[in-house]
């Protein structure tokens, strides 16, 4: 109930703001300027201004009262049509809403404000007290564009009035003229700037047949591809600028600014053939395999060494041990330290155990940077063992250049200069005082099997 009341406040405030800008300028600025008499010049100003105001109110009303489109009761994805589709297990699954307890059609999302799932949800807009979705997205974009047109024309009239006062300064304006000029500039300029930028953004989304939420999804998918978590995929709904705009504003370009009903049911959408067949839409966006309940296992037989022609082994599975250990084993003592080293002693640098608690799986495609790592903040003492987990470096698999004495001396000087804690440094040599390891200065971050020293630790 409280949310509904606040929604009415937002809508009422928006109506008052539009009315003030549209009518106060006509009554207190334009009408006195033309001597309070009907003339052709006056009509040239009032007719376009009132037409823009009418279209703003009309589209705003449609935005408020038009439902974005709810998910039909009992709707389920056409699983039978997906049998012939090759789908990567675990990273592509039909979408399901736990709050509403039903499957979600393509592009549908759950709104926490409305507490329901809407078709092709873009965002929840407090200014209209409604969500922007499939059935009212066109009304919303038209509303923004008409606000741009109306405020631009309004500002042109106000600027002309100011220039007239400056040119005919002997005709002193009344106090009401000055006050309402100031008020109109103070209200119209911020609206023109804010709505203008918002309009540019939503027109850009319409040209790409995307929504605000899908823009975030595409950024997330691009990050997963760059880190090698998933294979490269294409956004399936971009079918060309002209067709994209037609799908939102209607088939006739001459009526794009005229209110019209959205075509389609919002349950399925045309798909770009280069992205796959029509079933591709049921599996967008692909999920992060490392966040699934049962992530795919890591093959123990995979070798990291390069193939011929400067190619990499397609079975190579770089891991991110730091994130996996933080989520599963927050603290490791010295006994576990020695156990981990024994665990990996008989494995070469490219062989990794099939153990989900140690590492997460990622794709070996060429979208990784030099290191598959995440910037998660400082390394804490309980995470020192993460340096011993095998990690893969592109172009130099199985090799490590250990830092020499010059680096140790230089790093000691830098520690004193920047004031690092004893918790992560060598204050004194072993046996002479506090001794804590530096993970980045430890040998053996790549474990190599040594046949001559089978009883010793891996280097």
UniProtKB/Swiss-Prot annotation:
The chain crosses the membrane at residues 10-30, 38-58, 139-159, 178-198. Its EC number is 2.3.1.225. Residues 1-9, 59-138, 199-459 are cytoplasmic. InterPro entries: Palmitoyltrfase_DHHC, PFA4, PFA4/ZDH16/20/ERF2-like. Residues 95-145 form the DHHC domain. It is a multi-pass membrane protein. Keywords: Acyltransferase, Endoplasmic reticulum, Lipoprotein, Membrane, Palmitate, Transferase, Transmembrane, Transmembrane helix. Residues 331-356 have a biased composition (Basic and acidic residues). It holds the Pfam family DHHC. Residues 310-322 have a biased composition (Polar residues). Mediates the reversible addition of palmitate to target proteins, thereby regulating their membrane association and biological function. This is Palmitoyltransferase PFA4. It comes from Cryptococcus neoformans var. neoformans serotype D (strain JEC21 / ATCC MYA-565) (Filobasidiella neoformans). The lineage of its organism: Eukaryota, Fungi, Dikarya, Basidiomycota, Agaricomycotina. The gene is PFA4.
